[in-house]
Amino acid sequence: MYAIIETGGKQVKVEEGQEIYIEKLDAEAGESVNFDKVVLVGGDDVKVGSPYVEGASVTAKVEKHGRGKKIIVFKMKAKKNYRRKQGHRQPYTKVVIEKINA
């Protein structure tokens, strides 16, 4: 069984036991979180929500928080001596999907 959930402005396909990296959540490591915005539940019979499947939820456990690889944002205007270098690391949360309730 699989589900498509909406979190952090993105849609993610999840299955039980899967580890996923999502946008940072306000939850401590080891805490259990519940995703109510389930767009689709698949398996033997597929349930498609409009916009969300009623009564469906996905339970996950927060494993850790972290920051992604550093990316460099470099702005430059030729012949004008304009240079700006800025780094960015996106925060993320690693969760393990425990149960899909459909």
UniProtKB/Swiss-Prot annotation:
What InterPro entries does this protein map onto?
bL21-like, bL21-like_sf, Ribosomal_bL21, Ribosomal_bL21_CS
Per the record's keyword annotation, is RNA-binding included, yes or no?
yes
Tell me one Pfam family matched here: Ribosomal_L21p
**Gene Ontology CC entries for this record:** cytoplasm; ribonucleoprotein complex; ribosome
Against PROSITE patterns, the record matches this protein to: RIBOSOMAL_L21 (PS01169)
Assembly behavior:
Part of the 50S ribosomal subunit. Contacts protein L20.
The Swiss-Prot or TrEMBL record describes its family as follows: Belongs to the bacterial ribosomal protein bL21 family.
- Name this polypeptide is given: Large ribosomal subunit protein bL21
Q: Which organism is it from?
A: Halalkalibacterium halodurans (strain ATCC BAA-125 / DSM 18197 / FERM 7344 / JCM 9153 / C-125) (Bacillus halodurans)
